[in-house]
Amino acid sequence: GVHAIEQSAHFDTKKKISNKSNLIKSLNFFLNKKSISIKGLKKKTLNFHARYSAKKRIYIYLIRNHISPSVININREWHIINNLDLKILKKGASKYIGTHDFSTYRASNCNSKSAVRTISKVSVSKSKNLIIITFESKSFIKSQVRSMVGCLKYLGEKKWTIKKFVEVFKSKKRINCAPLAPAHALYLKKIIY
């Protein structure tokens, strides 16, 4: 599934927390069999909500673009053998920036009232054989990032032209979307409050 490098949660308590360090150690003791660890605690106001108070979320998607997969990062990157054109990927990714109706990328079981979202930044970079696609927005609809990456893959492989890519985006019809990119290569990198 999707990974989180940095995630936030909140809880209400009437009890005074006098030693944050001890609480972190205790929580991590009970979580030691899970793929999760508590890094820190911060006191917040009563109206704070870990999900709804977020100003920005940053996701990254990792693509291993090489003939051979990375054995160490299996189930952590999407291994794509076909060469992806980085210049075309960047051009396509730039089309996502701004306020748009992202209905094309919306999961059929999405409960969001609206598919209109504002993406403040999308970047595509490459280091050796690893392509990193970064998305920044206040919020995303269900499956949006994975759907957008799936469409970028088609574009990068030259299965689609930039014209076709934009037509699919503007169609607002899920049926026109490329297949979803796998969840195992998607990471919630950071939440900004």
Where on the chain are the PLM-derived regions?
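Structured-RNA-binding interfaces characteristic of tRNA pseudouridine synthases
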Residues: 1-193
